[in-house]
Amino acid sequence: MARMQGCSVLVLDDSDKLVNKYDHKVTVVCSYDPQGMAVRLLQEGATPPKQLEEYLVSGAGTTHLSRGHTSHMLVVGGELVLFRFASRGDCQQFRSLLHKLSGKVNSVFNLRTEDSSASQYFQFYGYLSQQQNMMQDFVRTSTYQRAIYNNAQDFQNKIVLDVGAGSGILSFFAVQAGAAKVYAVEASNMAQYAQQLVSSNNLTDRIIVIAGKIEEIDLPERVDVIISEPMGYMLYNERMLETYLHGKKWLKPDGKMYPSRGDLHVAPFTDEALYMEQYNKANFWMQTEFHGVNLVALRDAAMKEYFRQPIVDTFDIRICMAKSIRHTTNFLTADEKDLHRIQIDVEFHMLETGTCHGLAFWFDVEFAGTCSQIWLSTSPTEPLTHWYQVRCLLQTPIFVKQGQVLSGKVVLAANQRQSYDVEIDLKLEGTMISSSNTLDLKNPYFRYTGAPVAAPPGSNTTSPSEAFWSQLDAQGARNAVNLVNGITVNGLGEVDMSSTIINTNLMAIGGGANGGGPGGHQPNIHPGLISSTGRQQQQQQQQQQQQAAVGPQQQQQQQSTTAQQLAMTPPIGCAATSTQNVAQHQLIGGAISPSLFTSPAQPILNSHHHHPGQPIHGNQFY
């Protein structure tokens, strides 16, 4: 930010003569803006400072002309403005900023990005609500934290670059791990909020916030580590990974990158319900008498449009018909030009017979530190993140048989809208059957509703009804043993639904051994929701008879015990677990916690139970 005081501002009047726009001097403040440079005019002497005018000076839409040693003329938005500075030094400083701005017009970022797309992009990430959306993704944020903490050796007394810092949360993690200095580069207006957080946390000497694009800013020194969260849907969307790779021009030889590698997984899937959902949307245009109008002429165009939309949601991995193909990008060795066109050759050996409706995508990234390797996964087998998973439909599905080979390619072609066109070509080997589709990753269909993921049809190998009643009978038989202890149960045990009957189609909540509360049990149906069987009145009568046969002291003890039990009983409709409120109110990406829909227990930091992203065996994580 640059400030030039004692400046006069002149404009053309109706007779095309230069006249003073204000009857007083102003202070000219120049600051970074995602679209160029913001020039603000402040009234001098006003408390608090009063802004009189603001001009957005962009390299492409602004004409500027020197007028002597102390004056400079701009044409902004059709208005001619002459700045007459108090000194030659102030004028030279202003011209220097304009000169740098003209150089930014041809930056790598601007050459590959439409102005309208960049404007929307930086506006989106300039909202605190969007930063909160990402920060509340527990898996994302905690895995980054764990990766940095577990590899503190890579950060202690090191210089770190945070590319696309946003709120600065990763910069804070780096400092907490011992970093000597962090350059937090952020191109959106979020940079000012990041600066406020740095100042309020008394870290201005260790975190330097730089407002600007990594392709356009200068650093005073090279860095030891680059950290960033550059992943989008299907890993590559938003083309932020190219910016991340561009930052390597500031990385020392043998420097570290967090993350260091990305794997995009591709698998064929079957989902008749999803296919018909999209298909039926287009059938709206089959109407021949819609308020007297025949819509049929647009039906084919509508069908093509709906099937060009990638589907963003989550699913049961059992809908995948073959093992996923993995495409790896090593961030340490890859060049940003490698991401302009990404071709993935696929060959799927089908594991089951059915209709292939398209390809499913998800990604994993690795933090290859000196002390440990941590993985962040968006697989459908892992807790849900704000990246979800992505599915690309074929307008013409392919029927396949177990043992057949489905081959072809997936091409991600980068466009200037900070996204990709996804081209899919598949062929069933040994036949003439093939199908292809081109999708627009910039225009996805956000289908996720927060509902539990349903198992694919045909997943039950036993009768769910018989299993339910068998468990109910078994629990009743076990509780009948209570008769030995003198507890009246009217011939049948009181059925405890909370510990035995767990619907296998619903996933557990929380942090116990079996995904439940402190005791490891999480009920999906609370016993308070089950209507009385008629034995309650008989039990009350027999309890009254028993109380009449005991002394007053024993009655008082029984009443005390009953009161304690009632105090510990959760409200009707609530799960009997102490972790309920924590799990049910924890938000992920502004939506619903993945812990509500996944069977793994909720990770708890700084405990010996679960650490998100920390590998144990194979692809399993704590």
UniProtKB/Swiss-Prot annotation:
What Gene3D superfamilies does the entry give?
Hnrnp arginine n-methyltransferase1, Vaccinia Virus protein VP39
Q: How is it modified after translation?
A: The dimethylated protein is the major form.
Q: Which intervals carry biased composition (Low complexity)? A: 536-556
Binding positions for S-adenosyl-L-methionine per the UniProt entry: 131, 140, 164, 186, 215, 243
Q: Which InterPro entries match?
A: Arg_MeTrfase, PRMT_dom, SAM-dependent_MTases_sf
Q: Which cysteines are cross-linked by disulfides?
A: none
Q: Where can this protein be found?
A: Cytoplasm; Nucleus
**Recorded GO MF terms:** histone H3R17 methyltransferase activity; histone H3R2 methyltransferase activity; histone H3R26 methyltransferase activity; protein-arginine omega-N asymmetric methyltransferase activity; protein-arginine omega-N monomethyltransferase activity
Any one Gene Ontology cellular component term annotated for this protein = nucleus
Modified positions (Asymmetric dimethylarginine) in chain numbering: 478
Q: Which residues form the SAM-dependent MTase PRMT-type domain?
A: 118-425
Q: What is its EC number?
A: 2.1.1.319
Segments traversing the membrane: none
Annotated stretches, region: Disordered: 513-556, 602-622
Give the catalytic activity: L-arginyl-[protein] + 2 S-adenosyl-L-methionine = N(omega),N(omega)-dimethyl-L-arginyl-[protein] + 2 S-adenosyl-L-homocysteine + 2 H(+)
Q: What does this protein do?
A: Methylates (mono- and asymmetric dimethylation) the guanidino nitrogens of arginyl residues in proteins. May methylate histone H3 at 'Arg-17' and activate transcription via chromatin remodeling.
Protein name as it appears in the record: Histone-arginine methyltransferase CARMER
Organism of origin? Anopheles gambiae (African malaria mosquito)
